[in-house]
Amino acid sequence: MHVRPEHEAPAASRERAAPLDRAGRILSLQRSAGNRAVMSALRIDRKIEVRDVGRGEQSGFARVPEFIERLNGLSPSLNWKLEGRELVFEQTPDSTPTNFETQMMALVNQENVLPMRMTNRHGLLGDKASGFHDSVDGDAFTSGYVDIDDLLAGDDLGFQMLLVHFLTERAATSNYARRIGGNFSEAEFNRGHSLGIEAEAEILRAFFGDPSIRIVADSPSVTVRRVFRNSRGDRIRRRIRLGRGEETGVNASSVDVVTAGNIVMTPDDYRALLERERTAAQVERERLGGATEHREGGRSVPAP
């Protein structure tokens, strides 16, 4: 069955990109430890463009200041702003960027122009021949749309994962900006989509401090966009909350965790659980090694 690039392809997570192509280069940079690696490896250009939609279309451009505010709230070492329609950043001296910041810096500085055409919850997809009937679900690859209502409605992890996903997807596609509205092959969409999923996984690995997190299901249902699993057998889900009433048309991304024992947890609670278990494991290792004290919370305490 042919996959329309406007929609996500569950099989895409199985696609692999060639290790030395543009997409692989982007992913390698996104995995780098900080801004210096990004800056030294790529030409410094401002390549993410925030654009309005065309005349007569449903515009989300009025909410762009909220997008910039949200981006800054999630970027402790960066200051984001628009210069014209280009998204630019300034880094705080001697700061260490988070994984999200590192990925975003790499995307700003890669070679492709990445347009974000800001529509809203009322924007529709289709054509003049058959009509416009399909809502934009987060983003739309072929048209370059970004539903800013969907993006801003997400929780912090959901916002970050959706943003790096579609920007990575677009960055992996040759001459993306010039081809908006044209034809994209299933293979190139699948390649970018797979890299976008990996970019999401990187956000989760950094947040939970767990390198074992891997994708196991792509769009298994209308309200579950991704399912990741770690070596403990716990599942991390990016869920979609479908808006009702005044929020009809808003698809908000949020993240939760379902443990192997089927306990549903918030990301913060689950991260705290992992940290407690790591501390307990450290204490046990030190005890077995004959230590009389160990470090906990930055201070020395007697070993049990």
Question: Which residue stretches match the model-derived regions?
Answer:
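Juxtamembrane/interface and other helix-to-disorder boundary residues
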Residues: 1-95, 191-202, 254-304
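Soluble non-cytosolic domains of exported or imported proteins
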Residues: 32, 154-158, 190
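Active-site recognition of the HExxH zinc-binding catalytic motif
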Residues: 34, 158-174
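Auxiliary, metal-adjacent structural segments of Zn-dependent hydrolase domains
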Residues: 52-144
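Sec-exported extracytoplasmic/periplasmic mature domains
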Residues: 72-76, 168-176, 201, 205
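Short pre-active-site segment immediately N-terminal to the catalytic Zn-binding motif
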Residues: 146-162
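Short, solvent-exposed secondary-structure capping/transition elements
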Residues: 154-156, 171-183
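Post-HExxH zinc-binding segment in Zn-dependent metallohydrolases
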Residues: 175, 182-284, 289, 293
